């Protein structure tokens, strides 16, 4: 009696092609915040209008941020009902914050996911895996469980939670989705990132200017993607292929970006050296990623860069001698939404393909064949994703 052909079985489980992004959906809370008037609101709602010198400093930070507006769950009404959230670190507020997050993170995730599923055009019963990412939900079972329930996904959907990773995780989930899609023939992976500032919002402090900078940068948003290999002809349409991925920790960067969950919520630290640390290491990441494709002209690529702040984008652009047009989609998303942590790069991917179509480009990557996506975050960690565009027909 012949033995089981385990090798043949293993090969049958593998997809033939690269993982492809088959759909993208995004969502934001309805509350749009104008950056030009936010300093007045922020210092009034936190009871710090008397501190005019610090308020003027915050105004200058907002003016230099290159952000026009952001979307936030926290409205004046919500903050008035939860005054402890408006303190810096003087009073506990974690319970109040978590009560908000337990509702808002899954709700925003569901909205983005439904848009992605609608664009995909297939039954949600075809979703085999769920990767759920958030920096804001410590409950058990996790928000991945709640979102699967809200969407009515099949009980057998294989869930993975990516929690407490921060801003680089938009690249992390693409790396994970690639591995799942390419190693499980027929897999369709729903990837969701849902982030809200309800866990980090707090009043100003003269001794913690990094916290003040964060209050000027971050916004709320959720992204959702359908990822799968070997798109079904005439049924599914890829917008990008995920070709190669990597993660690296920047040397001598410990403590540059970090956060700690305490009774007062999630506090974060942002050192001023972050833009220089990223720009000093970005070229090594590019060489590692693209030498295998014999590409060394970075202007022949389309670019998706996590907008951790204006200074980071300026330093990366200068270090790599990028044409200013390369970061237009990235700067557009930063301007219109602020820093939405892990969800940002997916908003930029969506903007890139839409702008490519509107501008009459031949591919979803601004008429170019290949591109790069970068996520930056705590560690200091850099995620690198090599992408291939698809023709626009």
Swiss-Prot record:
<feature type="active site">
    <location>
        <position position="167"/>
    </location>
</feature>
<dbReference type="InterPro" id="IPR001099">
    <property type="entry name" value="Chalcone/stilbene_synt_N"/>
</dbReference>
<comment type="pathway">
    <text>Phytoalexin biosynthesis; hydropinosylvin biosynthesis.</text>
</comment>
<dbReference type="InterPro" id="IPR012328">
    <property type="entry name" value="Chalcone/stilbene_synt_C"/>
</dbReference>
<keyword id="KW-0012">Acyltransferase</keyword>
<dbReference type="InterPro" id="IPR016039">
    <property type="entry name" value="Thiolase-like"/>
</dbReference>
<dbReference type="GO" id="GO:0005737">
    <property type="term" value="C:cytoplasm"/>
</dbReference>
<keyword id="KW-0963">Cytoplasm</keyword>
<dbReference type="InterPro" id="IPR018088">
    <property type="entry name" value="Chalcone/stilbene_synthase_AS"/>
</dbReference>
<comment type="subunit">
    <text>Homodimer.</text>
</comment>
<dbReference type="GO" id="GO:0050198">
    <property type="term" value="F:pinosylvin synthase activity"/>
</dbReference>
<keyword id="KW-0808">Transferase</keyword>
<comment type="function">
    <text>Catalyzes the production of pinosylvin from cinnamoyl-CoA and malonyl-CoA, and dihydropinosylvin from dihydrocinnamoyl-CoA.</text>
</comment>
<dbReference type="GO" id="GO:0030639">
    <property type="term" value="P:polyketide biosynthetic process"/>
</dbReference>
<feature type="binding site">
    <location>
        <begin position="57"/>
        <end position="60"/>
    </location>
    <ligand>
        <name>substrate</name>
    </ligand>
</feature>
<keyword id="KW-0346">Stress response</keyword>
<comment type="similarity">
    <text>Belongs to the thiolase-like superfamily. Chalcone/stilbene synthases family.</text>
</comment>
<protein>
    <recommendedName>
        <fullName>Pinosylvin synthase</fullName>
        <ecNumber>2.3.1.146</ecNumber>
    </recommendedName>
</protein>
<feature type="binding site">
    <location>
        <position position="270"/>
    </location>
    <ligand>
        <name>substrate</name>
    </ligand>
</feature>
<dbReference type="InterPro" id="IPR011141">
    <property type="entry name" value="Polyketide_synthase_type-III"/>
</dbReference>
<dbReference type="Pfam" id="PF00195">
    <property type="entry name" value="Chal_sti_synt_N"/>
</dbReference>
<dbReference type="Pfam" id="PF02797">
    <property type="entry name" value="Chal_sti_synt_C"/>
</dbReference>
<feature type="binding site">
    <location>
        <begin position="308"/>
        <end position="310"/>
    </location>
    <ligand>
        <name>substrate</name>
    </ligand>
</feature>
